[in-house]
A protein has these predicted regions:
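Aromatic- and Gly/Pro-enriched helix-to-coil junctions and flexible linker segments
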Residues: 316-321
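Non-transmembrane, membrane-proximal soluble domains of secreted or membrane proteins
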Residues: 1-179, 183-232, 240, 247-297, ...
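"…together with the soluble PPM/PP2C metallo-phosphatase catalytic core" -> "…together
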Residues: 237
Length: 322
C-alpha cells in the first residue's frame, strides 16, 4: 500500500502543478530581431562588430558596424562569429562565456547571452603584439526596448553639417584629417557636391570573405587611407558618442559609465558629462597615450600634430556623433 500512497501523492501534486501552468500568461512573442548575428572582428588592437539583423548566411553586407562595445538584448541568445584581419586574437567576456580565438581565414560560431542588464568587461587573451594588454572590449546588455532603440539609432546615417552650424569646422577637420582611416556614414563618403558616392556598408563585405581570407589579403574595410594600415581598417565613428569607451576600450569616454550602464541607462550616455581632457590628450598625441601601438608600422593611430584649436574643434564634433 505504501507505493500506492506515494504514487497518489505524486499524481496529486502533478495535477496541481499543471493546473497552475494554465494560469501563467502565455509566453511573450519572439523578440524583435530574433535572427540577429554579429561578426566579431579582431585586429591590432581593437574589436569591430558587424551586425546582421536577419542572419548572416546569404547577406551581402552588414546592416551596421560599430567598434569596441558589442551590444546585445538581455535574455536572448546572440550568435557571433569570431575572426581576425591580421593575427590571432581571443575574444573573452569572463562573466558571459569562455574564450574564443579569432583567427584569420576562419569564422568560429559561438553564442553569448546575458541574463542581466549591464556592461561586462573583456580582454583579448591571445598575445597579439606589443599593445596586446590594451586590447579590451565590453559587452553591453540592454532591455529589449532599449536594444530596439539602440538598433534604430545605429541604422541612421548623418547628414553633412551646414556652414552655419557651430560644429561645421570640426566636421571639416575630421574629413581632412581623420577620414583617411575613419568613417562617419553619410559624411565621409560624399563628393564635393554632397552626393553619397558609395555604400558605406558594402566595403565591409560579408562572412564569405572572412572565411576565404588567410594570407593578409582581406578586403573588408580597406577604404582609402585605412588600406595602408596593417589591418586595413579603423573604427567606424558614425555613432562614436553612443559608446562608453574608445581606443580598444582602453579609455572611458564617460566617467561613471559602468554604474550608468549597470543601472540600465546606457542609452543616456550621450549628452552627459564626458572626459574631455582624456579625449583631448588622445587627439594631441595618441602614441603617447596608448603604449606600443606602433603607428610607425601602420598599427594604431598616429600623432596628427593638431593645434590646440583644432583639437578643441574635433572634440566638440566627436561628442555630437550620437
Amino acid at each position: 500500500i505504501g507505493p500506492t500512497i506515494l504514487m497518489a501523492a505524486i499524481a496529486l501534486f502533478s495535477v496541481g502543478f499543471l493546473l497552475n501552468l494554465d494560469d501563467v500568461d502565455a509566453a511573450p512573442e519572439e523578440a524583435n530581431y530574433p535572427e540577429v548575428e554579429v561578426i566579431v572582428v579582431g585586429q591590432q588592437w581593437w574589436w569591430e562588430y558587424h551586425y546582421y539583423l536577419d542572419g548572416i548566411e546569404g547577406a551581402s553586407q552588414p546592416d551596421f558596424v560599430t567598434a569596441n562595445e558589442i551590444v546585445i538584448p538581455v535574455n536572448q541568445d546572440v550568435r557571433i562569429y569570431t575572426t581576425s584581419r591580421d593575427v590571432i586574437h581571443s575574444f573573452w567576456i569572463p562573466r558571459l562565456n569562455g574564450k574564443k580565438d579569432a583567427v584569420p581565414g576562419r569564422t568560429t560560431p559561438w553564442v553569448i547571452q546575458s541574463n542581466e542588464i549591464g556592461r561586462f568587461a573583456g580582454q583579448c587573451t591571445e598575445f597579439c603584439g606589443l599593445s596586446h594588454a590594451y586590447m579590451r572590449m565590453y559587452t553591453v546588455s540592454l532591455s529589449e526596448t532599449d536594444f530596439l532603440a539602440w538598433v534604430a539609432n545605429q541604422l541612421t546615417i548623418r547628414d553633412p553639417l551646414p556652414e552655419d552650424d557651430p560644429n561645421y569646422e570640426g566636421e571639416q577637420l575630421f574629413i581632412s584629417n581623420c577620414s583617411r582611416c575613419h568613417v562617419v556614414n553619410g559624411v565621409t563618403e560624399r563628393d564635393v557636391n554632397g552626393t553619397i558616392t558609395s555604400d558605406s556598408m558594402a566595403m565591409y563585405g560579408n562572412i564569405e570573405e572572412f572565411r576565404n581570407h588567410s594570407d593578409g589579403t582581406l578586403s573588408q574595410g580597406k577604404y582609402t587611407g585605412a588600406a595602408n594600415l596593417t589591418s586595413g581598417a579603423a573604427p567606424n565613428l558614425t555613432h562614436f558618442a553612443t559608446r562608453s569607451s574608445y581606443s580598444g576600450s582602453f579609455f572611458e569616454l564617460y566617467p561613471g559609465a559602468q554604474e550608468i550602464a549597470d543601472q540600465g541607462n546606457y542609452l543616456g550616455l550621450p549628452g552627459s558629462d564626458y572626459a574631455r581632457g582624456t579625449l583631448e590628450a588622445w587627439l594631441r598625441n595618441s602614441p603617447k597615450e596608448k603604449p606600443n601601438a606602433q603607428p610607425e608600422q601602420a598599427r594604431g593611430m598616429p600623432n596628427l600634430n593638431l593645434s590646440e584649436a583644432q583639437i578643441d574643434l574635433l572634440v566638440d564634433y566627436l561628442v555630437t556623433l550620437d
